[in-house]
Amino acid sequence: MALVNRNKKKKESTVHFSKEDQRKILCADSPFVVKEAYSSIRTNLLFSQKGEDCPIFVVTSPTANNGKSINSVNMAISFAQMGKKTLLIDGDMRNPTLHRLFSIPVKNGLSEILAGLTDSITVSKTDVENLSILTAGKIPPNPSELLSNERTDKLLSFVKQHYDCVFIDTPPVNLVTDPTAFATKSTGYI
């Protein structure tokens, strides 16, 4: 496997959220209480990481539209702001959102890697220092099967060598089995 970094042009705005969601994204202008809430979550996650060099946190929710993707982004930003080299993976290959939120192409995303269509792991750097994104890639017909194959283990082992922390945004756990594929591969679920 090879890691390919795709840099954003500085003239582009990285994040293209709806106005409502923009107010929810962690930034310098966020209210103190919001910053403090994510700092508290970050501290709790750091204490729960079992001494791992690169913890992997899987973010899910019981049902759709509970804000898990916004929380995934904010937790990843919180770790990146602390100086941790952070990778945010869009593990929702059924309804991917991170490529739209960050306006990045889906080439060589998670689905292509797990299907064996590429050996290149193409991550996109963001305007947030220390934060990179691996998109879900093109929507496959069989996400659960892809996540259950040995390439998932190889991918996670590979990214653990290059990052300090990994967050995986997954689909709702009560709707599909995809999030459970990470049970033995992750530090924990959020």
Predicted regions and their residues:
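P-loop NTP-binding module
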Residues: 1-190
